[in-house]
Structures are given as C-alpha cells and as structure tokens.
Amino acid sequence: MPENPSSSPTEPPEQSAAFEKWRSGLAQFTGLGLSESEKAERERLKAQGKLAKDWDKCEGWKRDLMNYSPMITFLLNHLKLAGCPFPSSAMQCHPCPENRAGGFSPDHGILLCQDRFFNKKHMEDTLAHELVHAFDHCRFKVDWGNLRHHACSEIRAANLSGDCRFTREVKRGFYAFNKQHQACVKRRAILSVLANPACTSPEMAERAVNEVWESCFTDTRPFDEIY
C-alpha cells in the first residue's frame, strides 16, 4: 500500500527562496513583520533615499536657474563683473532645519536647503536673496559682525529678491495691502539681524534696521529698480 503524502510537503529550494524574497519585499514595503533592527534599517534606507532624491531635485533646479532664470543669470553676471565669479560649486544643496531655506557665508558660499523648497520659484527667490548678499560682500566689503552692515544687506536682499512679493506674504499669513512690501522687508530684515551673534535683543535688531533703512531700501544695485 503506498504511503500517504505528507500533510506539509517540503517546497523545492527555489520556490522557498522565491517566497522568502516576496515576503521580505512585502515586509520592507509595509513595515509589518520586521524586527526592530530591520525597522531601523528600513527607516535609514528611506531617509537615505529621500536625501538623494531631494539633492538630485535641488541640483537640477539649481542648474536650470543658473542657465535660464533672468534674475539669477543677471546677478551671477554682475558678481563676475564685480570680480567675484560665483561657480555652481559655491552653491551647495544640503538638508536643513525647518526654519530656513538658505544661507550665505563669506567662507563657504551659498547654502540651498534641498528639503525646504515648496517649488522651483521658492528656490529662485532664495538663491536670489543669497546672491544679493554675495554681491554686497564682494562689492561693499560687508563686515557681518557690524549690525548696521548686516541690516543693510538684509534689507536689500529681502527687497530685491522677490522674497517679499505679495503671494509669498499670503503664504506666510500676512495680508496687509498698505505698504505690504516695505513691512515685509523690514520684518524679515529684523529677524535676520536678530540671529546675528552680535545682536543681543529684538530692540537692537530693530534699531540697526531703522538706522540704515532709508539709504538701503532705496539702493537697488545692481538692478535699476526693484525686480
């Protein structure tokens, strides 16, 4: 009499391996059934993938803006004319904290916060803002530890870059129609000066901005007028 077949036959090795690959892939996709170490590795790989994706997008937008944005190409050209050519390598894409989109350092160039841009237009405004700082540093030898110097460059950058256009202000929750642009420029300049290590109070930041307001708000170099 023939033997009864086993109630739990052993799968062929290749079928078992295929099932395990499918199970592992599903677990990685859903996060279900993973050990704590596997979950940690999954999150690490996801974060790594997002960093790479954000960096690729930031670099692509940067390349497009450097080639096709009238605002950015204008500023880059005037930096070159002023004796301070600004290559692509001086504009670095990196992840940042939530409260910033970019930055300028005389020693390191421009920081573009790859994970903080709503869209390419936001990045264009940010890059223009930082390039105005770069232009000021090149042309006017700004002492960034001097609050009046810093305030002047922040006024000019906020005024000229598009950072204070009406649509940007609406997104921030500011809806004033009367002198909205001036109010935005002053507010954002004060906030930036307040972050200067040499500034010890909001009153000091506001005073520095007010002291240079008239001359710096009307100074549109290298533009003929507000863009």
Curated annotation (Swiss-Prot):
<dbReference type="InterPro" id="IPR019165">
    <property type="entry name" value="Peptidase_M76_ATP23"/>
</dbReference>
<protein>
    <recommendedName>
        <fullName>Mitochondrial inner membrane protease ATP23</fullName>
        <ecNumber>3.4.24.-</ecNumber>
    </recommendedName>
</protein>
<keyword id="KW-0482">Metalloprotease</keyword>
<dbReference type="Pfam" id="PF09768">
    <property type="entry name" value="Peptidase_M76"/>
</dbReference>
<dbReference type="GO" id="GO:0046872">
    <property type="term" value="F:metal ion binding"/>
</dbReference>
<keyword id="KW-0496">Mitochondrion</keyword>
<keyword id="KW-0645">Protease</keyword>
<feature type="binding site">
    <location>
        <position position="133"/>
    </location>
    <ligand>
        <name>a divalent metal cation</name>
    </ligand>
</feature>
<dbReference type="GO" id="GO:0005743">
    <property type="term" value="C:mitochondrial inner membrane"/>
</dbReference>
<comment type="function">
    <text>Has a dual role in the assembly of mitochondrial ATPase. Acts as a protease that removes N-terminal residues of mitochondrial ATPase CF(0) subunit 6 at the intermembrane space side. Also involved in the correct assembly of the membrane-embedded ATPase CF(0) particle, probably mediating association of subunit 6 with the subunit 9 ring.</text>
</comment>
<keyword id="KW-0479">Metal-binding</keyword>
<dbReference type="GO" id="GO:0004222">
    <property type="term" value="F:metalloendopeptidase activity"/>
</dbReference>
<keyword id="KW-0472">Membrane</keyword>
<feature type="binding site">
    <location>
        <position position="129"/>
    </location>
    <ligand>
        <name>a divalent metal cation</name>
    </ligand>
</feature>
<keyword id="KW-0999">Mitochondrion inner membrane</keyword>
<comment type="similarity">
    <text>Belongs to the peptidase M76 family.</text>
</comment>
<dbReference type="GO" id="GO:0033615">
    <property type="term" value="P:mitochondrial proton-transporting ATP synthase complex assembly"/>
</dbReference>
<feature type="active site">
    <location>
        <position position="130"/>
    </location>
</feature>
<keyword id="KW-0378">Hydrolase</keyword>
<dbReference type="GO" id="GO:0034982">
    <property type="term" value="P:mitochondrial protein processing"/>
</dbReference>
